[in-house]
Amino acid sequence: MRKILLFATVIGFLIMVSGTLSYFYDVESQRSTFKSGHWASEIYPTVSFVKKESPVKIDFYGKPNEEYSYDVIFRIVDAPGIPKLSWDGDDFVQFSLRKNVNDWEVGMHLSPQTNGTYVGELTISYPSYPYKVVEIPVTITLEE
């Protein structure tokens, strides 16, 4: 009886350790494939769900006489299993900034319109400046 109990304890401990290690490995490997965006970044790598892609220029207006312009890649991403990120509802959209601004997290929820455009709200988070989030309403036409 004592041997069986000891054996079961050792096996249980090994299962627990291997599960913990595999969880951290999976999280890190997925995070490394996700360039920007924060809604699905902990769950799905972006590259698996890209439906179409188009270059877009985004202009940011700050204080008077301050204007920032960035070339970005616009991707519509289908991430099954996440609520509100399906093609019959809101589409998850990710922007990958081409400039070296890795501390920005950028994403958007969009609704397709009958005229071929997508209307939604661009959300930009600045993790280096805690709790600062900018939301900009935009309309974008994709090039096929």
Curated annotation (Swiss-Prot):
Record's protein name: Uncharacterized protein AF_1656
Name the UniProt key words of this record, in alphabetical order.
Signal
Determine the domain of life of the protein's source.
Answer: Archaea
Signal peptide (UniProt feature, chain positions): 1-23
